Amino acid sequence: MMNGFGIKNNGEFYSVSLQFGAHKLCGSGRFSNVYCGQMISPIEKEVAVKNVWSDTETRHLATSEYPEIQILSKLFHPAISNLLYFYSRNANDKVINCLVLDYLPQDLARLRDQGVKFDVLDAKLYTFQLFCAISHLTSKNIVHMDIKPQNVVMDRMAGRLKLADFGNARRLETNEKTGSAYQVTRFYRPPELLFGCEKFTASIDIWSATCVAFELFANRVLFKGKDTKDQIVLITGVFGYPTDDDIKSIGVKRPRVARKDARGIETFTSKMLDSEIYDFMKATLKIDPKKRKSAIDVLKMPLFDILRSSPPKKRSNGVEMPNLASYTEMHHKREPETEVVADIQTTEKAEKESDSTNEELED
């Protein structure tokens, strides 16, 4: 057992006792790692536990004030890897913030690298869910800032997708600058950040999500630049050198790359996709972020009409499509709140498993 916190529907925190079964390491990075396993109490559920090391900017903060926890506490949606509980622990004189999150077994990057191909219906289904997640973020004035295949988790059998990893997310109302044009991974970085703009808007996520959606439809990266300049060259080669109005709208200096005529997205991708997919891409991949279609407007596009058909279309694996009616709702309630959690008498085996889990999480 360990002491942690849950989240009420109004975003407030409450104390709760947490117990986990065995976990295994599922992913690691410079500042965090993720374990996957079973939560035993207060609910039985497969979860992901993200361990984040505090840095110089966050080490003085209480766990509940940690930026990612603050942002996730404002969100709850079926297409988001929701924060269920959180706690902290000390290891090697460092505070580690631990986020207990919704879990899905795969991510798009691994599936792509394994050569998995999605049929058009499933690609539309996953794209729809991704833009539902962005629409929910926009309604809460939040920008993810790092949408990429590694942060898109999935259950292929069930046809479900969740947007994960909000470590770079920001609130729009703070008028905060990005601080660096490197906030978004290069292949998915929109032109305004490549050009050096430090202001961020919800349109950043629109560009990134469209690049991810292309991978669902085409099974390859859309803009695979070798470096920042090459990324700019690729994008301007498709859409043309930014106009005077584009530069003024973005508020940056002119990029120092050769001026070429626009090839167009169809030619660049060898006209491999259906026209309605290109209509979607041309509406969301605009040099000027103010001209990109919003997530809520994207969801109304003809691209997704097949998902609204009645009766629902059958997926190729025979499994019914998820009920998408709730995905477009802006407000979702968390699980029934339990503020007082009874102590659970554990067996010797469970105690040993818990001790083993704690040792693993401290590695």
UniProtKB/Swiss-Prot annotation:
ATP binds at C26, G27, S28, G29, R30, F31, S32, N33, V34, K50. May be an autophosphorylating tyrosine kinase, a bifunctional (serine/tyrosine-specific) protein kinase, or a serine kinase that is a substrate for an associated tyrosine kinase. Acting in concert with putative serine/threonine-protein kinase gskl-2, required for sister chromatid segregation and spermatid budding during male meiosis. Plays a role in regulating female meiosis II, together with gskl-2. Involved in sperm pseudopod formation and function, together with gskl-2. The active site is at D146 (proton acceptor). SUPFAM superfamilies: Protein kinase-like (PK-like). Residues 20-304 form the Protein kinase domain. Transmembrane segments: none annotated. Belongs to the protein kinase superfamily. Ser/Thr protein kinase family. Keywords: ATP-binding, Cell projection, Cytoplasm, Kinase, Nucleotide-binding, Serine/threonine-protein kinase, Transferase. Its EC number is 2.7.11.1. It is found in: Cytoplasm; Cell projection, Pseudopodium. This is Putative serine/threonine-protein kinase gskl-1. GO terms for biological process: cell differentiation; negative regulation of canonical Wnt signaling pathway; positive regulation of proteasomal ubiquitin-dependent protein catabolic process; regulation of microtubule cytoskeleton organization; signal transduction. Its main location: cytoplasm. Residues 346-355 have a biased composition (Basic and acidic residues). Gene3D superfamilies: Phosphorylase Kinase, domain 1 (3.30.200.20), Transferase(Phosphotransferase) domain 1 (1.10.510.10). Expressed during multiple stages of spermatogenesis, in males and hermaphrodites (at protein level). Residues 311-363 are annotated as: Disordered. One of its GO terms (molecular function) is protein serine kinase activity. It catalyses: L-seryl-[protein] + ATP = O-phospho-L-seryl-[protein] + ADP + H(+); L-threonyl-[protein] + ATP = O-phospho-L-threonyl-[protein] + ADP + H(+). GO terms for cellular component: axon; cytoplasm; cytosol; nucleus.
